[in-house]
């Protein structure tokens, strides 16, 4: 049994034995005027955080539930499994595929900063970045991060535990949604 989180504001009060939350939620950020790591992430890597009061209209419907926190400006969304930014980070592509990206937000940012070609594995498009090691190190310092000894993007894979439907109606056709 799946419970639609989009129509239930107080999901935690719902007690359905064995029910799995489905749908999407949003983690939004407070916009500031100053340049910080997150504005650099947007400018340099095309990762646009979802700002408070500016929630996007998103039609796709994930099962189980995902919490969206950013988009790529091209119909792709970044999300976590609903337990905050310490939980695994996923990417929902415009082809409605769910990709596992990293074990948590910190590791995700580390990968995006130091491996700017990480998205090639998902899109197949060649990324071109001309940043020196010093520029990458400075970028990482905005988040208190340094380069990893392992290639973090090698862990990217299609996540089979999530199904992404075109919309809630398509999900209802295929799943047992309440």
State where each predicted segment sits.
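A surface-exposed partner-binding patch
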Residues: 1-85, 144-178
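Generic preference for well-ordered secondary structure
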Residues: 53, 89-96, 136, 152
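Short, flexible coil/linker segments at or flanking structured domains
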Residues: 55-57, 93-96, 131, 156
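Alpha-helix initiation/capping motif
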Residues: 80, 110, 137-138, 164
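Compact, glycine/acidic-enriched structural inserts
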Residues: 89-128
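An amphipathic alpha-helical core segment
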Residues: 113-155
